């Protein structure tokens, strides 16, 4: 490569990530691709030649956040007209060229399946093109060989599949991420082996429907077994699954292997069968409760968390009460709870009226949050006196004299740093912690000698 070509390609890339862990992982993929193309990464947008916003499209406020952020970057574009600004991810895929009609300082719009093209697209911008959009969905792209290096201390995310085939009526993911395709299991094993060599002790496997993983003759349970057999990773977690894909042999594997953490995120979305049918969730209230019963029969000390939407189109007060009844019956450890908001391009937006008044949605959400907070507190209080094996993940955000980590069943736990102990030497170690008190969000305890 000539000096001139090197100068044209060189530059500092800043990536700002919004949304889920999958986006965090994808930002790692983009960083790796840009490094391979001889760009360097930057932690400062003010001192960068390229700014990427890796975006989310799941919630209504996600779009507003990005519009506001792009407007706030306008002064950098005025100061440096050669600055390249791109929107990546689900919002890019969802809105495409429409983003260029908003009078925003924007050069590139690139969907999740097109990140390999970023270096070439930047060169086209630098040669004078503008407003380039690339949002093709792929049936095969999994970025198998890319090393994203998405590491947080002693834990890391590993994407094992991309896309979704379920087409829930409220969800934009199948339209922004494409159809399901799974990575080669051998490439996943290699990635985890590499992470272990780098000091990673815990991984979280990612996918839009992570337990729908299927590649060659390997299903999700088979992949877990490979990771248990062929790597020394200490703890394996996963998110987000679908309730329809919990075969008995997967649960038995969890019950028999302490390295496969008994921590399941099981999205309910609604507790009324008619509403679930409108959502196209492919299970009834009774079928969901049967899945919960089987999980708890096979994995007694499991932690179960969930997602719930209130105010879905045509949801009546009685149907909302059904959701509250399911929450009381299941006793979730924790829940992510949201008011329904229309997402452009979804079946619900096209076919169903957003006809539950905003004040009713807000009242229902408040009622649900109050109920779940009370349940979470009781669930955590029931753990007082118990002893858990906890992998120390970090220093507590509230005090440098406190350490934190999660129980195998997923509850965040904080406990004092032992006197005359080096903090850095503790992070990544596994200790026995006795629980002494609890809030709705956190367990508090002490390390046993």
Curated annotation (Swiss-Prot):
Cofactor note: Binds 2 [4Fe-4S] clusters. One cluster is coordinated with 3 cysteines and an exchangeable S-adenosyl-L-methionine.
All residue ranges annotated as the Radical SAM core domain in the record: 150-378
Binding site for [4Fe-4S] cluster 2: 164, 168, 171
The entry's keywords: 4Fe-4S, Cytoplasm, Iron, Iron-sulfur, Metal-binding, S-adenosyl-L-methionine, Transferase, tRNA processing
GO molecular function: 4 iron, 4 sulfur cluster binding; metal ion binding; N6-isopentenyladenosine methylthiotransferase activity
Domain MTTase N-terminal: 11-127
Domain (TRAM) ranges: 381-449
GO biological process: tRNA methylthiolation
Pfam families on file: Radical_SAM (PF04055), TRAM (PF01938), UPF0004 (PF00919)
Compartments, as annotated in UniProt: Cytoplasm
Catalysed reaction equations from the record: N(6)-dimethylallyladenosine(37) in tRNA + (sulfur carrier)-SH + AH2 + 2 S-adenosyl-L-methionine = 2-methylsulfanyl-N(6)-dimethylallyladenosine(37) in tRNA + (sulfur carrier)-H + 5'-deoxyadenosine + L-methionine + A + S-adenosyl-L-homocysteine + 2 H(+)
Keyword tRNA processing tagged: yes
Record PROSITE patterns: MTTASE_N, MTTASE_RADICAL, RADICAL_SAM, TRAM
Database matches in InterPro entries: Elp3/MiaA/NifB-like_rSAM, Methylthiotransferase, Methylthiotransferase_CS, Methylthiotransferase_N, Methylthiotransferase_N_sf, MiaB_methiolase, rSAM, rSAM_horseshoe
Enzyme Commission number, as recorded: 2.8.4.3
Summary of subunit composition and partner proteins: Monomer.
Family: Belongs to the methylthiotransferase family. MiaB subfamily.
Protein name: tRNA-2-methylthio-N(6)-dimethylallyladenosine synthase
């Amino acid at each position: 490569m000539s000096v001139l070509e090197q100068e044209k390609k060189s530059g500092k890339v800043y990536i700002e990530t919004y949304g889920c862990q999958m986006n965090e992982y994808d930002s790692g993929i983009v960083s790796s691709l840009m490094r391979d193309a001889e760009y360097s990464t930057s932690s400062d947008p003010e001192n960068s030649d390229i700014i990427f916003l890796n975006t989310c499209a799941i919630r209504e406020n996600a779009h507003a956040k990005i519009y506001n952020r792009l407007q706030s970057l306008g002064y950098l574009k005025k100061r440096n007209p050669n600055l390249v600004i791109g929107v990546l991810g689900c919002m890019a895929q969802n809105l495409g060229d429409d983003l260029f009609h908003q009078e925003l300082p924007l050069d590139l719009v690139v969907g999740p399946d097109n990140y390999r093209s970023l270096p070439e697209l930047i060169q086209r911008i630098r040669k004078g093109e503008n407003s380039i959009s690339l949002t093709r969905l792929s049936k095969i792209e999994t970025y198998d060989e890319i090393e994203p290096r998405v590491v947080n201390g002693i834990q890391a995310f590993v994407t094992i599949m991309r896309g979704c085939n379920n087409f829930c009526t409220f969800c934009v993911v199948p339209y922004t991420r494409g159809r399901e395709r799974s990575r080669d299991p051998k490439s996943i094993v290699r990635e985890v082996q590499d992470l272990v060599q780098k000091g990673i002790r815990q991984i979280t496997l990612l996918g839009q429907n992570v337990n729908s993983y299927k590649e060659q003759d390997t299903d999700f349970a088979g992949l877990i077994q490979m990771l248990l057999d062929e790597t020394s990773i200490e703890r394996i977690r996963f998110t987000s699954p679908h309730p329809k894909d919990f075969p008995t042999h997967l649960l038995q594997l969890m019950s028999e292997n302490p390295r496969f953490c008994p921590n399941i995120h099981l999205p309910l979305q609604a507790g009324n069968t008619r509403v679930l049918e409108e959502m196209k969730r492919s299970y009834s209230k009774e079928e969901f409760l049967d899945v919960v019963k089987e999980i708890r029969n096979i994995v007694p000390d499991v932690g179960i968390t969930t997602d719930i939407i209130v105010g879905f189109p045509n949801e009546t007060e009685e149907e909302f009460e059904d959701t509250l009844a399911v929450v009381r019956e299941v006793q979730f450890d924790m829940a992510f709870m949201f008011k329904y908001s229309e997402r452009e391009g979804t079946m619900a937006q096209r076919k169903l009226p957003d006809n539950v008044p905003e004040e009713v949605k807000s009242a229902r959400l408040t009622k649900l949050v109050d109920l779940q907070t009370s349940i979470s507190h009781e669930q955590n209080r029931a753990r007082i006196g118990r002893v858990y094996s906890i992998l120390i993940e970090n220093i507590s955000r509230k005090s440098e004299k406190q350490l934190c980590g999660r129980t195998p069943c997923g509850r965040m736990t904080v406990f004092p740093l032992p006197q005359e102990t080096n903090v850095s030497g503790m992070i990544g170690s596994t200790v026995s912690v006795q629980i002494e008190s609890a809030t709705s969000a956190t367990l508090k305890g002490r390390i046993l000698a």
